Amino acid sequence: FCSVLLSALSLHSCTLDEYNPGAFTKEALATSIDGYETLINQCYFAMERFYYGAADWMSLTEGDTDLWTYKANESTSYTQWFWFFAGTSPNTTYTNNWWNGTYDGVGACNEAIALGDKPPYTTEEERNAKIAEARFLRAVYYFNAVEQFGAVTMLTEPVVTETLTYSPTRTDPMTIYQEVIIPDLRFASEWLPTGTHATTTTPTKKAALGFLAKACLQTYEYGSTEYLQEALDAAKKLITDCETGGGKYNTYMYPSYSEVFKESNNWENKEALWKHRWYAGADGHGSSNGNYKLNRNDEYFLCNINKFGAREDNQETRLTWEGSITGIFMPTQHLLSLYVQKDGTLDPRFHESFTTEWNANKNYTWDESAVHMYDKEEAVIGKALNEGDLAIKFIMPQDMDYATEKQKEHISDYLLIDYHHVYSDDNNNVNMNYAYTNVTGNYKNDGTNENQFRHYYPSLNKHNSSNYYVANASKQRNGNLNATFIMRMAEVYLIAAEADIYLNGGANAAGYINKVRERAGANPLTGSITVRDILDERGRELCGEYCRFYDLKRTGMFKNSEYLENTHPDLARFFHPNYALRPISTTFTATITNGSEYQNPGY
């Protein structure tokens, strides 16, 4: 019975309808509290399967932006995620999971909301708290749907046989914000419980208020100012609570940035407004993707350190915080430049957020081939590195020891990577070629050789983990048990700052943004704060946290290619304003009678 029910509830409908011929079963199930909460649990199914922390959601929310390029700046792979298809015909099926996931999730939420009067809760507070879970999740599904796809079909009631259609219509984003997203988040912020710092996956009041502020601010993208005051008000509720002890909403911001992503603070992270983690153990697991496909974010950001001979990818190292899985996200020159302060020093968040040194995990001796490839002097041949020794070091011009390290780049027994070897400040991009100092054989000084150093770059460590369930050691199948933070308190200050610019000309914006900067140990911003200042600050604070694609849309940076030409010119050459929306999966559009009309422009 349960397996049949779960299959029915998670049915992928090719008509955007959640029609289930066994709907009476759900009505019967909803007449008991346990049964109804089974329906509530089903609302989470698509979220945990496809969204925050799941495979490629990071790419949909952070890729194709100014902050990231594909590993080593290669433009022949993952083109839909990082290169706006790189000038080729767009892939129109890669969004299939999220398109189906939206309507699986919305369908489950609609069922739970519609049947909310059935279970015998003793108080309306208990009943509404459960309904609020479904309404919060429905808002999040629709929020992501409209920001990824634009106008989508708006469904707010369970679909019955009589309403099935193979010619669906699309509803514009603002209408969905007005009629579903914002009302659902208002309801959720009123009725969800406060929870504790240990509350995970289940949303709380602070999650609802945070997403209400986020959603209201996002409507500015559509030329609306109607909800900006509500965005600011919701943000201020959380800020006031945070600065007075968190007594009402349980909000908190760590005194130092370094505490936010400490693994010891992960499961009960106080700053996270909403977080999710998976369970896996010998007694079972809670992931529909399998017991080793849990939080996948730890797999995405590490540079290819295994390309150097003192490193290797092995099971033992995979279980350490340092890790060994080569990722797909490389920071752009623009992202790294954001951490250079006006006085020439580095924002402390750079070295907190990015790993720039790696130790050897095997014994290694430099041979002639490696010495020549990495532009070392002949004297380095035969030098040895022992396991645990410094193996790779990336240096920034602003580092205190930069000049000293720079002098050793050709003679050090570790691989020394100079920022200027990898990135070009003149061209705002990655150097694909390199001019050798120690010329030998095919390694020349005319800049025609492939740049081997571009494989090594600062690697975001916000999602690093040493907390794994080992599902199969021989196959290196390890499930990351750490939570992913979907939204945290620092973002609320930046939402308030941006809303204040739109509403009040930024009179209070500096106060909000400098709270975040002061906590990080960065120099305070002075003078008038602009939207670009906010966008830059969001890059520093929130890179790799599911925000950037939506940030660029909201602030108008996808209206034309000008912004990308100045921040990520390699990406700008492939940009078209149509690509601010993803393609609706042609797996779906092929099943309806108005597929061409339903599809987004440019696909």
Pin down the residues of each PLM region.
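Bacterial Sec-type N-terminal signal peptides, specifically the leucine/valine-rich hydrophobic h-region
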Residues: 8-11, 142
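Flexible, polar/acidic helix-loop-strand segments at domain edges
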Residues: 330-485
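Long, intrinsically disordered, low-complexity segments
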Residues: 14-16, 44, 71, 102-103, ...
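Short coil/turn linking the two alpha-helices of tandem helical-hairpin repeats
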Residues: 146-147, 151-153, 196, 215-224, ...
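Conserved, well-structured interaction surfaces
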Residues: 32-38, 45-51, 73-149, 168-179, ...
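Membrane-proximal, proline-rich intrinsically disordered regions
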Residues: 14-60, 593-603
